[in-house]
A protein has these predicted regions:
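Ser/Thr-centric signal marking residues that sit
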Residues: 13, 67, 104, 161-162
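Active-site core of metal-dependent hydrolases
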Residues: 1-72, 89-94
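His/Asp/Glu-enriched, well-ordered alpha-helical/loop segment
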Residues: 6-8, 52-137, 151-154
């Protein structure tokens, strides 16, 4: 209520974690258009609880997936998210669509509230942010089961090439145009 009273909540506000949040507070977030970023590994690592992701979805709150700097690997966070939500709900068949939706759809929607150029989508005029994975699936791979491969097969270390805003920054597992020794010396 303090955040609402002081005018902090709104369509450009993102709250992290939201672990101990009541249904009434969820309603406030929905009514103000406030977003939530769930950071499952951080929550587990700090033993602070589990965000009620499925309830936030049911309330119509835009919730994305983050890392809280606990990892740099979004696929790792995705893999933790699904079993964590299933464990929290004591239901082994929930959360599939929500988990991948948070990373691939909702994170793009969140970015759209902050940036003019579309991010997280492949379409003309959008930032050409793409990763190319070196992944050899053991089972058939198609657009219909890509989520399963992301959750159970791929890992961040499979990333072979990274393109950001149309510029290749990492190719064949080597940085392009970046002096790693110079950066490491500075660190």
């Amino acid at each position: 209520n303090r955040l609402l009273y002081n005018g902090v909540l709104g369509e450009k506000t993102m709250l992290g974690h939201c672990i101990h949040i009541s249904p009434a507070e969820m309603d406030i977030l929905r009514e103000t258009g406030t977003m939530v970023c769930h950071n499952p590994e951080s929550n587990m690592g700090n033993a602070v609880g589990c965000s009620p992701v499925l309830q936030l979805f049911q309330k119509g709150i835009l919730i994305g997936l983050g890392t809280d700097a606990y990892t740099h690997d979004m696929l790792e966070s995705l893999k933790v998210l699904l079993p964590m939500q299933r464990h929290n709900a004591c239901l082994p068949n929930v959360g599939w669509r929500e988990a991948t939706g948070m990373l691939f759809e909702n994170n793009a929607k969140i970015c759209a509230r902050y940036f003019k150029k579309p991010l997280g989508v492949l379409k003309p005029g959008a930032a050409a942010d793409v990763i190319i994975m070196d992944y050899k699936p053991f089972t058939p791979f198609s657009h219909e089961n890509v989520d399963g491969h992301m959750l159970f097969g791929m890992e961040g270390k499979n990333c072979r090439t990274t393109i950001i805003n149309g510029k290749v920054l990492y190719k064949d597992r080597e940085f392009v145009g970046i002096d790693e020794d110079k950066i490491n010396a500075f660190c």
